[in-house]
């Protein structure tokens, strides 16, 4: 009986969430906290425990799902498993308990301009073959264990490859049972699936650093644009391979520094947006929504986002003005978030409740709104304010009219027929590192089923491809 009850709860929550994301009017405002280290505080764990042991991060989420009436949340919003990053020897993380105190969130340590992971003169190498560049140049620079090209291979080099790849497989495989546990034990929806980042954000985050990229935009913008174009097919491919097979929950894009004043409006319009918009459109053509997790203030770019197909995105409010976002985007796209993290950390619960009520009664008055904090909730938010946001949503978020039916999810094209040429005909092709056409020249004539040999080669090649790209995107 309990199993049936949880399944009914899950079905109702999923309908509520999907209805809102497709701009419908559900029975009430769905609640979807992107709760990271705050879950550790609720569960009695330290930041070190939920960052270095993903099983404890999973358990912290389950305890929150049990104790709060959330419609959806992320299976592990801490996400970066520092056991894996240590196995790969990654230099750019401050690990709780090792590099920073045990109850401090992990830190990303961007290198100085002089020690950037990609040098300015290496743009052509990245453009010519992104995957080869990642393995031969980028990986040895970001890791203390992997050897540079031309160096003698070491024991630590070989061990790092084996440990980190097996750790990645273990970690990603564990998400399936975690999502099922959320559904079975708590009736809670896993809020997102997959991952996307803008090409220009990747250049700044993992290759050139912000300072280096800023100078490149001013001095060699053509090379920056070519690099972004070279990354596009791979980022689109990665997003599609991780998307929800049912096309119910969105693919998130973590938008870091693509807004003014980090870059100029000119560079947004000439580089950032032209190399991101086609990816979002390609995902939508396959029936996948994208969650624009717009970190920072994006008011200057809302009109550009409004040119996307209706319902194709969910726009998340960090520091974007909620009223302006609703005016420009609210007729086409669902909005989410808007509860300032500083208020969740320092305000009294009554003030948090008032903020939630205002959001519901203004931008959420006609549906198409999902309650959440402005940014990922780390360990600075208080449990009292987390409860206040939850309770206020249930109290003020009930709509007067009956729930509208869940809108039909756009049908996905068969196979990859709907993918544009810039993905399917990219050279090198997304999804492989060493193409079969190259490998077959090293082999004797194939006997028996040649297509079987090619298929198995491509499938296993895909694992090597996913490994390096997830080091870039996920870790």
Model-derived features: positions:
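Catalytic cores of TIM-barrel enzymes
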Residues: 1-475
């Amino acid at each position: 009986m309990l199993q049936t009850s949880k399944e009914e709860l899950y079905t109702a929550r999923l309908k509520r969430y999907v209805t809102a994301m497709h701009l419908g009017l559900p029975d009430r405002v769905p609640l979807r906290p992107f709760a990271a280290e705050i879950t550790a505080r609720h569960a009695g764990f330290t930041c070190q425990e939920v960052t270095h042991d993903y099983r404890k991060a999973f358990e912290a989420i389950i305890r929150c799902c049990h104790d709060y009436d959330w419609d959806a949340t992320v299976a592990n919003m801490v996400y970066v498993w520092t056991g894996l990053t240590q196995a790969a020897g990654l230099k750019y993380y401050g690990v709780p308990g090792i590099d920073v105190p045990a109850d401090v969130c992990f830190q990303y340590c961007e290198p100085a301009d002089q020690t950037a992971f990609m040098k300015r003169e290496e743009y052509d190498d990245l453009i010519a073959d992104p995957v080869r560049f990642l393995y031969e140049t980028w990986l040895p620079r970001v890791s203390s264990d992997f050897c540079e090209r031309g160096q003698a291979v070491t024991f630590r080099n070989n061990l790092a490859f084996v440990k980190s790849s097996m750790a990645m497989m273990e970690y990603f495989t564990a998400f399936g049972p975690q999502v099922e546990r959320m559904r079975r034990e708590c009736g809670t929806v896993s809020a997102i699936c997959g991952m996307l980042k803008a090409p220009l954000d990747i250049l700044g985050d993992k290759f050139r650093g912000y300072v280096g990229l800023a100078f490149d935009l001013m001095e060699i913008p053509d090379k920056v644009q070519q690099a972004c174009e070279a990354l596009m097919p791979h980022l689109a491919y990665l997003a599609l391979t991780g998307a929800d097979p049912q096309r119910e929950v969105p693919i998130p894009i973590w938008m870091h520094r693509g807004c003014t004043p980090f870059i100029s409006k000119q560079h947004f319009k000439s580089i950032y947006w032209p190399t991101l918009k086609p990816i979002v459109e390609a995902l939508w053509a396959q029936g996948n929504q994208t969650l624009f997790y717009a970190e920072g203030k994006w008011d200057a770019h809302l009109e550009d986002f409004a040119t996307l197909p209706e319902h194709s995105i969910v726009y998340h409010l960090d520091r974007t003005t909620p009223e302006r976002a609703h005016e420009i985007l609210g007729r086409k796209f669902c909005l989410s978030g808007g509860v300032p993290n500083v208020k969740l950390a320092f305000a009294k619960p009554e003030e948090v409740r008032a903020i939630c009520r205002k959001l519901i009664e203004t931008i959420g008055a006609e549906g198409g709104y999902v309650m959440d904090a402005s940014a990922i909730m780390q360990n600075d938010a208080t449990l009292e304010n987390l409860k206040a946001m939850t309770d206020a949503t249930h109290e003020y978020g009930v709509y007067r009219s009956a729930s509208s039916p869940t809108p039909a999810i756009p049908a996905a094209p068969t196979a990859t027929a709907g993918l544009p040429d810039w993905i399917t005909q990219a050279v090198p092709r997304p999804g492989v590192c060493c193409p079969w056409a190259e490998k077959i020249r090293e082999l004797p004539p194939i006997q028996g089923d040649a297509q079987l040999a090619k298929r198995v080669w491509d499938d296993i090649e895909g694992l090597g491809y996913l490994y390096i790209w997830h080091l870039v995107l996920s870790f």
